[in-house]
Amino acid sequence: MAEGWLMNPSDKWTYRFHRDEKSWVRDQKVFVDMGRPMPDGSPALLKTRQHLRREDAEKFWKNLLSYGWQRVPAVWGADAEF
């Protein structure tokens, strides 16, 4: 898991899953940020950040997909397409 994005199509809340590079070698952890893109193009509204073990993050990802969340390209940050 390098980085991935999931969005709830009904309300546009989005999860960003990305590695914690500082812990990746010894104890693989993932940051999971929840936010929503702003319609006027201003910075995203970030609500929460979780710090999960890689296995837990993968389970969470699969669970969200089973509830209808969809993979999307980057929604905010340097990789986002505007």
Feature map (PLM): residue ranges:
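Terminus-proximal functional modules
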Residues: 1-82
